[in-house]
Amino acid sequence: MNTVRVTFLLVFVLAVSLGQADKDENRMEMQEKTEQGKSYLDFAENLLLQKLEELEAKLLEEDSEESRNSRQKRCIGEGVPCDENDPRCCSGFVCLKPTLHGIWYKSYYCYKK
């Protein structure tokens, strides 16, 4: 009976000491995995940030191309009423007070220079 107790006590002590070592080892492994996970998350975050910056650059480039290619405001042709303060006559035309026709309208018209 005494040998059974000693054997049981020996097995118990070995199990506790090895279990404690495994617990410390597991803690170290978990800490390493957590650090690796953080580095992986940092890497993924940087990669996502680069992709977003590339996408933003493309969008801004498209906006600048669109504004460059956008149609200008339409201009007013010959004999069309215009505003003397904001003449939008086409190039080669000027906003003048009418000479003969259109005197009764009391407005300005686009005429050739």
Swiss-Prot record:
Propeptide: 22-74
Signal peptide residues on this chain, from the entry's feature table: 1-21
UniProt keyword Disulfide bond present: yes
Pfam families: Toxin_22
Recorded coiled-coil stretches: none
Disulfide bond keyword on record: yes
Intrachain disulfide bonds: C75-C90, C82-C95, C89-C110
A cellular component annotation (GO) from this entry: extracellular region
Sorted UniProt keywords: Disulfide bond, Ion channel impairing toxin, Knottin, Secreted, Signal, Toxin
GO molecular function, one term: toxin activity
Tissue-by-tissue expression: Expressed by the venom gland.
Listed InterPro entries: Toxin_22 (IPR012627)
Region (Disordered): 61-83
Subcellular location per the Swiss-Prot or TrEMBL entry: Secreted
Family membership noted in the UniProt record: Belongs to the neurotoxin 14 (magi-1) family. 01 (HNTX-16) subfamily.
Domain notes: The presence of a 'disulfide through disulfide knot' structurally defines this protein as a knottin.
Physiological role: Probable ion channel inhibitor.
Name of the protein this chain belongs to: U11-theraphotoxin-Hhn1k
Species for this entry: Cyriopagopus hainanus
